[in-house]
Amino acid sequence: MPREHMQSAKVVLILCSCFFAYGTYWSDWSFDYYFLWANLADHPNAVSRATQYYTNQLDAPDIIKYIPFVNLIIAAVGLSAGLANMTDGNILFDGASLVLMLFALSTYATSVKPAIKNISDAELVNELTTNLKNIAAAHFIITLAITGIVGLQITHYVLNKRADNAERAEAVAAAAAKKSK
């Protein structure tokens, strides 16, 4: 029973972290959409609005910039709790989730962060558009990585529940067989 609670708590921590990240990228979607899926010529204000939005993010107070680190710590605690169990399933599912998390972090660090910094220095519309397209593409890639983490964690949780239910059924059957003797 304690193993079940640990598994549930781990999944809750990781999923809460993932859904917080989804919310963050969802708020960016209203600006990113035009650079991925629409014709910019049909939306002449898209570049200026996105530029203003990401410039404001760069100028945000430091406390707001540190909030995502709390989210990462929550996810790290959840993944650490899973990896601490050292079962094959935990190593496979939580290890793959960790790889996806590191991939998302590296995508953010190498694509999003530099592009946001470049926006404030860019003077040509082509430079701005290129940086905004890089941000939008990186956000999409990060969202796919987060979706992979959610899928892995839910699958692992369901498989563990099935295994636990099968163990209980076997124990009940063994107890019933023992009683009937």
Show where each model-derived region lies.
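Eukaryotic polytopic
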Residues: 83-160
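Transmembrane alpha-helix entry/boundary detector in multi-pass membrane proteins
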Residues: 41-73, 89-97
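Non-transmembrane, juxtamembrane loop and terminal tail segments
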Residues: 165-181
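Interhelical loop segments of eukaryotic multi-pass membrane proteins
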Residues: 30-51, 98, 117-125, 164-170
